């Protein structure tokens, strides 16, 4: 049969409450005190109830929580007590122990002293209202056996006070059994959660929450202690996880910088290994027909898409010569004819076929004197070059001459003659055929830094193109300045150039003599000045309509050593037949003759005296006038420029752009200046 249950319910409502004290000692202890104008109590026991009104009074609530707020349990254990006074007397005294939850507006505690008793106490303070609710369930015989309510105050509150005292005494009497049951449940939950966390996250999972409320102070304390000792707060464990380093760096034990260095050294070892070749060596080896093990010399891949590819430190000619030492010559010869390598000077490639060069040591022609002389050897002393490959041969000769003059002039003279097959087995590097270098057939030489062979080759090709093609179309030898000879051609010659060319043709075995290529100048030389010298003449046809020269940006640089040497040779050659100054052409006056530097169309002799008189008479010596004077002095000292000025002074434009770094020059003067500079470079 079911035992009768008693249910006590109390509802307090306060009018015009005002909080006068709120003291929060820490997160687990809070005290609040209110004053009110009047209060109303609704007291119900089972099916009976009554209402009680109180006047002014105050209410004090104390909330205590055991353990830390972050212990991990769903509800913290603690207690809450509420004392109410009215009309100067104590009207109510409520106390409940159990699981507690509180915040700024709501405070509630639920307690259970055993299987036959439970209680709830809640206080709500929100929007100017204050309410207190108290509910308790217990057995009738349980309450009657614990004693009457004689010690209580008023009759209306006797049952509540007795119930509260009975709840406390019952909790102390029946506490051990309930605490043991709750402790076992919590231990089982902790065991299960510990197994789950260790299996899923390796002992780093989130801590579980110990649920369930228990009566008695010792039970609540034990649950909080076990939660703190066995399982930590999940937020703290996650924070420790974030501070750990990533597993990759933790396993390797090396920082990212050390790993990057390790990758770099590994790549270097693979590139210089005995059996492997990197990508650049494979590309250069495929172009030269080579193979085999990896070489120590690194050659950059040639790329024609780059306009400044000739500035690379390595040229494919060295890679070709080194690969030819390790292989048979006939195999390399086949690859050299069929493959066309990229030009290192950025120029497009022209395939070179066999039979273009015919060897004839005894024959020499004026067309061979138009290019720079090749290195003197038994096989290549003189070669007849077709007109289509004149520029390519001149560029190749300049390249080889530069290498011989720099490295070993003595060894170049004593080099043994090479076979025809080895001479022809060269890979076209640019638009020219490069003869084999005997110096690289020996032990591999250390890399030279940097090489300017490709730059010299490009400059030589530019000079040859300007000399062979462009000057033939320019109206520099027009009938406006020079009288035509029979047949409409003009004989243009220079005595010093002819002497140098004759000396080159008669040179023996030894260091190659370097000579400036014969220049097509604009001066008129009488036929008597070249008596006893092999004639080196060029028949130039003059077009009908003379166009104006092209404006080009060019630095004005003349080597004084070349100027003095050329001036000495010019003075010795012109002693027999001096050059008569031509009459000034009509309309040849300069447009801007500021300091009377070149008044009228005067020649180079009277310009210096007029400049000195103008410089002494002028009061202001500005920087512009000094620059112009220096320029004219350099022109007077240079025989090539003086010769061109004698014949072409009238073709000069009036404005001088030397202050701005610009100057309008004729292509013939440009070729003369560049040739003089290159000749001085070879002489040094």
Swiss-Prot record:
Comp. bias intervals (Low complexity): 359-377, 612-622
Protein name in UniProt: Early phosphoprotein p84
Compositional bias of kind Basic and acidic residues: 180-191, 232-245, 258-272
Top-rank taxon: Viruses
Compositional bias segments (type: Gly residues): 201-220, 285-296, 598-608
Location within or outside the cell: Host nucleus; Virion
Sequence ranges of Basic residues compositional bias: 326-335
The organism of origin for this protein: Human cytomegalovirus (strain Merlin) (HHV-5)
Lineage: Viruses, Duplodnaviria, Heunggongvirae, Peploviricota, Herviviricetes
GO cellular component, one term: host cell nucleus
Subunit details: Isoforms 1, 2, 3 and 4 interacts with themselves and with each other via their shared N-terminal regions; these interactions are important to both their intranuclear targeting and the recruitment of UL44 to subnuclear sites for viral replication.
Keyword Calcium tagged: no
